[in-house]
């Protein structure tokens, strides 16, 4: 089975082998050296002053960021299930929250966000996804973050980059917390998340003492000494060490980002050549999202007959979206096979006669023929 879901993504052999190493104890000097190396690489990757690793899914990092940085009121963008989650986190902690709702295919707009900030002067934290993976939508987070800081530099900007980190370069000048997750571009199983922090965010965290398991003040103190407050995600840390080695072998992050972009753009062009429609108005490079009334049938047929697993949508698009992953290090022939299988499935359902258009278009675009 070829797994092409946008999280958890397929774990290649090189990454799987990192989990077969003898288990080190997390309170040893040997592990501390690995932990330090991984954190330093993550700092370079994100461009922020500090990076904290947490034993949790990405939702844990979202919660930790909100409770640590928001003292008064929260503003968040809801353009899908993961944007909605910021509001649920705020509610669980009795934080007053202001919601900006957008259609799942529509990126957030700067003007609407600035108007909400001006109308609610107690807002001191703003949350948004870089990529809202419910529909594969890329928000203009860099532009939004800059506008917020120019309007009110005291507002903390929290960006869920779980499906953007490791996919494309992110401009983080105006970002205070950048959230990542292990099961996306890092090609690891779920259960580890990270938060990259600006100096402003670090100062806020050190002033406060909130939470227990997600107490970032405690984690800052310990992780600066290359350890963790509680049990570290040991094998995930070893996996990250291997991930950075693989990226280096590819030629570094610039080469990885360029490769991901080539595959994403070629996939989008192939999908359009098949007469299908791309769902978001501003597509992310992390996935190609197709909207079709036949999405459920196509997805099931692809899995059962062609051994290719794409992701469907979530409510209210459960049966009308197909999401094709581009995150991680994916051999180009696998992407070509997956798109060819999609065209074959269209033929099987009498939706389009097979003529090899998907592969032809994909490979021509990828190799710029």
From Swiss-Prot:
UniProt EC number: 2.6.1.-
What cofactor does this chain's UniProt record say it requires?
pyridoxal 5'-phosphate
Keywords assigned: Aminotransferase, Pyridoxal phosphate, Transferase
**Top-level taxon in the UniProt lineage:** Bacteria
Where in the sequence is N6-(pyridoxal phosphate)lysine found?
Answer: 184
Reply yes or no: does the keyword Protein transport apply. no
UniProt cross-references to InterPro entries, sorted A to Z = Aminotrans_V_dom, PyrdxlP-dep_Trfase, PyrdxlP-dep_Trfase_major, PyrdxlP-dep_Trfase_small, SP_NH2Trfase/AEP_transaminase
- GO terms for MF: transaminase activity
**Which family would the database say this protein is a member of?**
Belongs to the class-V pyridoxal-phosphate-dependent aminotransferase family.
- Which protein are we looking at? Uncharacterized aminotransferase jhp_0673
Species this chain originates from? Helicobacter pylori (strain J99 / ATCC 700824) (Campylobacter pylori J99)
């Amino acid at each position: 089975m070829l797994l092409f879901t946008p999280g958890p993504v397929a774990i290649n052999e090189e990454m799987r082998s990192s989990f077969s190493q003898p288990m080190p104890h997390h309170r040893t000097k040997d592990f501390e050296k690995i932990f330090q190396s991984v954190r330093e690489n993550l700092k370079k990757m994100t461009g922020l002053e500090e990076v904290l690793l947490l034993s949790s899914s990405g939702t844990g990092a979202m919660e930790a960021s909100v409770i640590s940085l928001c003292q008064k009121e929260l503003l968040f963008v809801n353009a899908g299930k993961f944007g909605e989650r910021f509001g649920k986190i705020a509610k669980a902690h009795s934080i007053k929250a202001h919601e900006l709702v957008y259609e799942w295919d529509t990126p957030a707009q700067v003007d609407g966000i600035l108007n909400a900030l001006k109308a609610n002067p107690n807002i001191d934290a703003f949350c948004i996804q870089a990529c809202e993976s419910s529909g594969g939508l890329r928000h203009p987070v860099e532009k939004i973050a800059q506008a917020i800081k120019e309007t009110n530099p005291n507002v903390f900007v929290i960006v869920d980059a779980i499906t953007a980190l490791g996919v494309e370069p992110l401009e983080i000048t105006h970002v205070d917390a950048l959230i990542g997750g292990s099961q996306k571009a890092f090609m690891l199983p779920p259960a580890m998340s990270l938060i990259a922090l600006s100096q402003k965010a670090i100062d806020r965290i050190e002033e406060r003492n909130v939470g227990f398991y997600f107490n970032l003040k405690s984690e800052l103190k310990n992780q600066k000494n290359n350890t963790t407050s509680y049990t570290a995600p040991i094998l995930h840390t070893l996996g990250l060490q291997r991930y950075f080695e693989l990226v280096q072998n590819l030629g570094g992050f610039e080469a990885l980002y360029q490769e991901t972009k080539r595959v994403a753009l070629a996939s989008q062009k192939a999908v359009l050549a098949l007469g299908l429609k791309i769902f978001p108005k501003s597509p992310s490079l992390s996935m190609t999202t197709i909207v079709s009334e036949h999405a459920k049938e196509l997805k099931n047929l692809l899995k059962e007959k062609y051994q290719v697993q794409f992701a469907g949508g979530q409510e209210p698009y459960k049966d009308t979206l197909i999401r094709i992953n581009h995150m991680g290090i994916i051999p180009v022939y696998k992407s070509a096979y997956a798109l060819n299988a999609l065209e074959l499935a269209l033929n099987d359902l009498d939706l389009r006669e097979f003529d090899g258009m998907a592969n032809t278009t994909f490979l021509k675009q990828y190799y710029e023929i």
